[in-house]
Design a protein with these regions (language model features):
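Conserved phosphate/anionic-ligand binding catalytic regions in large, soluble enzymes, centered on
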Residues: 47-67, 153-156, 235, 239-251, ...
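Gly/Ser/Thr-enriched, mixed-charge loops and adjacent short helices
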Residues: 18-22, 26, 42-51, 161-288, ...
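Phosphate-binding and adjacent anionic-ligand microenvironments
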Residues: 295, 299-301, 322-324, 342-536, ...
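An N-terminal, well-structured beta->alpha segment
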Residues: 2, 6-113, 202-235, 243
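N-terminal small/polar loop signature for handling phosphorylated ligands or for N-terminal nucleophile
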Residues: 97-160, 258-314
């Protein structure tokens, strides 16, 4: 990287602009140190590109540079966003909601955002302190705002922060707005940013919105009677040092649960996440303290939310009494099954309901929907695409749930992003229903596998940081397109999908168009035995993801679980080998 003289020259030219008096002394010192360092790796990583809106908006490591999260990048993004909002709603007194999570610099970034919006004549509803992502989405809709910003990096490591841009429906921005905002942001120079806020246009919000949101979350409840019968369900909850502590214990009590215990060490708000390596519910290590307390209290289940409380983790007991962490696919399966089965039983299905899942999420959900005559829809990764299906079908069909394999689910339509407070309340209702029927969540999972088919899903992450890494990832996708695999771990591929061209090619050579609202840099391969592999570069992190799913039709009951899991793991190892991912 350091020998690329043209790239170094370009980065130095951009970096020198950051030595102007428009930037504070600390920033100038940090940039000068990178310029003076003979090793230009840090300089290139900090300045080789501008942070772009991916599936989750802006997200990056905090520090000086165009490719870093800092108040200037946040400022220019907000100035561009403000310009776009004012152009999109000419002559209107526009309003936005601004919130943040527990991350370092989060409050400073949120106040910077609020100042810039207000300086551009836009009314700002600024949350008085940290709040869950779904509450910010809810508030945009509740207050009739034109847009919103949430300062969060979700579950990323402590070095990161981010910026999620929302539109007037409470969902993250999609085309044409995302491109329009980027165009406006790219026009902005640092001297264009109006950093001096108009305090008269900044309105603090907090407790009243919390109450409205908690009342709305109760709409996700399916069967109140089962909660009343099992109100002593023994629940352990952790907010993982984040925003869930503000809302989730209250929400659980509002549903009627009375036996709620919290992990005290993780109730401390801290952007350094001192008790975990990474505050990611996908990592088993992050659940260690919760499981320890759950064992001590003989809890029925352990649940957690990530720092911005959009995603959740669920831990239940297996027949040996050991803790079993459900993965994101299992979580979505369980929600989908329970919502459909119990709404049907209670006569709540009218025939116009639909579920949504992302294309990389397990196909078992499709089986659950099909067997129960409920429509399901596939969409791209990123919850904004689930929100898009809700928006398209609003007034025509009834949304009853949607989720993705990365531990996100939304069980009602008053919010347009993944919602861990609502999902955590609902999983506790499901656990109560299971206990009411002499079962555990684990038993329920086995029942679903027996009825709808066993599948094992593993996401393989290939990390390639920096500029060279981005080039490697691009080349991998090019190679897969030019030389697509013919088999996966010994299974013949019968269908190749390319969402860049929106073409699906069958083994007999016939090609069909894929019906999606936009193109996306995703490849999918389907085998005759039900094996599925989806390949996509991450929109928020320097990695390429391989989502693998393997079926086993021999699963008949819980006693088959270990054998089928082992066989599936062997199959996935063979798939990795065939794709040279070892």
């Amino acid at each position: 990287m350091a020998n690329n003289s043209e790239l170094i020259k370009q980065c130095e030219m951009v970096a020198k602009e950051w030595l102007s008096p428009s930037f504070d002394e600390q920033t100038r010192k940090e940039v000068q140190a990178m310029l003076d360092n003979p090793d230009k790796t840090d300089l290139i990583d900090a300045f080789y590109q501008n942070l772009e809106f991916g599936t989750g908006g802006l997200r990056g490591i905090m520090g000086a540079g165009t490719n870093r999260m800092n108040k200037y990048i946040v400022g220019m993004a907000t100035q561009g966003f403000a310009n776009y909002i004012n152009k999109a709603f000419p002559g209107k007194q526009c309003a936005v909601v601004v919130g943040h999570d527990c991350r370092n610099n989060g409050r400073m970034f949120a106040e910077t955002v609020a100042d810039i919006f207000s300086a551009n004549g836009i009314k700002v509803y600024l949350f008085e302190s940290l709040r869950p992502t779904p509450e910010i989405s809810f508030a945009i809709r509740q207050l009739g705002c034109q847009a919103g910003v949430n300062v969060t990096a979700s579950h990323n490591p402590r070095e990161y922060n981010g910026y999620k841009a929302y539109w007037d429906d409470g969902a993250q921005v999609l085309a044409p707005h995302d491109k329009g905002i980027i165009d406006e942001v790219n026009k902005v120079k640092i001297e264009d940013v109006k950093f001096e806020g108009n305090k008269d246009l900044i309105i603090p919000i907090g407790g009243e919105m919390d109450w409205d949101y908690i009342q709305a979350v109760k709409e996700a409840m399916v069967d109140q009677d089962v909660i009343l019968r099992q109100k002593d369900l023994n629940i352990v909850y952790s907010p993982m040092h984040g925003t869930g502590r503000v809302i989730i214990p209250m929400a659980l009590r509002s549903w009627g649960f009375q036996n709620i215990h919290v992990v005290p060490e993780q109730m401390v708000i801290d952007g350094n996440f001192p008790t975990v390596v990474s505050p990611n519910p996908e990592n088993a290590e992050a659940m260690t303290l919760g499981m320890k307390l759950g064992t001590k209290l003989n809890a029925d289940l352990v649940i957690a939310s990530d720092p911005d409380a959009d995603r959740l983790a669920i831990v239940c007991r297996n027949p040996k009494g050991e803790w079993e962490i459900l993965n994101g696919n299992q979580t979505c399966m369980m929600f989908s099954w329970y919502i459909i089965a119990n709404k049907k039983k209670l006569g709540q299905l009218k025939g116009n309901e639909f579920l949504v899942k992302t294309i990389v999420t397990t196909e078992v959900i499709a089986e659950i929907a099909k067997k129960n005559n409920v429509e399901y829809m596939d969409c791209y990764t990123g919850f904004k695409w689930i929100a898009n299906e809700i928006r398209i079908n609003e007034g025509k069909k009834k949304y009853i749930g949607g989720g993705e394999e990365s531990f996100g689910f939304l069980p009602f339509d008053k919010v347009r992003d993944k919602d861990s407070p609502a999902s955590i309340c609902l999983i506790c209702e499901i656990a109560a229903w299971a206990r009411d029927n002499g079962k555990t969540l684990y038993d329920l999972l086995m029942d679903i596998y027996a009825e709808y088919g066993f599948s094992k899903e593993v996401t393989i992450n290939v990390v390639r940081p920096g500029k060279t890494g981005a080039d490697e990832i691009k080349q991998m996708m090019t190679n897969f397109r030019e030389n697509p695999p013919k088999e996966l771990g010994g299974s013949k591929i019968c269908l190749w999908k390319d969402y860049q061209t929106l073409e699906a090619k069958k083994a007999d050579g016939t090609v069909e168009k894929i019906n999606m609202p936009a193109t996306s840099n995703v490849l999918q391969w389907f085998c005759e035995d039900g094996t599925k592999v989806s390949v996509r570069p991450s929109g928020t992190e320097p990695k390429i993801k391989f989502y693998t799913e393997v079926k086993d039709p021999s699963f008949k009951c819980a006693g088959c679980y270990e054998r089928c899991t082992k066989a599936a793991e062997d199959k996935i190892a063979a798939i990795k080998k065939s794709l040279n991912l070892e």
